[in-house]
Structures are given as structure tokens and as C-alpha cells.
């Protein structure tokens, strides 16, 4: 049993402090996840609060058969979709989130500028992916969810997620190579 499930079980048994622990444990990652769909952090925070209100109102819906985090994120995903009804689906990933995944040994100004450019290019490459690809990249690399957990969030089989993850990585690699080639061509002109 994962920590989220254990805390939620305590909440179901009447320990109100457990809800505070759940909120503290998941609020930032859930808000960032929702923000990836709607692109407005303030609205994402409101939706995150709605997710926890749903947990209070619908206490018995989580069966405990799996990890709590995918259950929570699927509620967040559904609420984000409802919020965006009629809007285009685009996942936004902040440069700060992307920056954590790029290496940097030298904190010099030049390296910081190069890193920022790399972050912007990576962010643009991710934004150019199909929505399912953007979503799976976010869940894998920014939320560190397993294929099984992602399958629950995206309501697909684990095999579909495995295939989708492969295609998403290939597509992202293609986007990055394309951008790199365009950059080199511009430098040679």
C-alpha cells in the first residue's frame, strides 16, 4: 500500500487530519498537472481544491485496488477536461519544470543562458506534440508515474500506454532533431 492510499484510509476512518496530509502531499503536483491542461495556474488551483472537495463528498469511490495518486490525478484530469469544454487541449509545461531535467554543472551566466534556450526549445518541442503524447510525457517525466498508473489516469490499457510512450518519445526526439537542424541551418546562413 502506497503512502497516499494509507493516508486516505485513515481519512476514511474519520481522521480529519489525514485530509490535510493528503492536500500537503499532492497539492503542488496536482495543481501543476491540471495547469498543464488549462494553462492558468490560478484556475488550476481552484480545480485542485474541487478535486479534494470531491474526495470529501465521494469518500467511498476509491477502492484501494491501486495506488492513490493515479486515482487522484484521474479526478483532476476529468475536472480539467470539464473546465476546458470547448477549449483546445494543450499541455503547458513551465520552463522551471523542464529545467530540472537538463544537466548543468557550471552555474556561469553563459551556461544559464544556454540552459534557458534549451529549456525553451524543449518546451516548444513538447508543445508541438499531439495531446496524448504531451500528456504521457508529462505523467512519465514530471510526475514519475508508472505505465500502470498512467493507464489508470488516461483510461487506457498498460499495453496501449507502453506503445503510446514509445511513440511519444520518438515524436519528441523527432521534434528536437528537427529544431536542431533548423538551428544549424540558421547558423550557417
Can you say where each PLM-predicted feature lies in the sequence?
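N-terminal module of bacterial RNA polymerase sigma factors
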Residues: 1-29, 174, 185-189
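C-terminal edge and immediately downstream basic/flexible tail or linker adjoining helix-turn-helix-like DNA-binding
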Residues: 6, 10, 39, 92, ...
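Sigma70-family region 2
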Residues: 12-13, 39, 50-67
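Amphipathic, Lys/Arg- and hydrophobic-enriched alpha-helical face
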Residues: 23-41, 58, 126, 175-178
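Structural recognition of an alpha-helix C-terminal capping motif at a helix-to-coil junction
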Residues: 46-53, 66-78
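Arg/Lys-rich amphipathic alpha helix in sigma70-family domain 2
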Residues: 60-63, 74-95, 115
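Acidic, proline/glycine-rich intrinsically disordered inter-domain spacer in sigma factors
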Residues: 99-127
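DNA-recognition helix of helix-turn-helix
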Residues: 125, 133, 142, 148-179
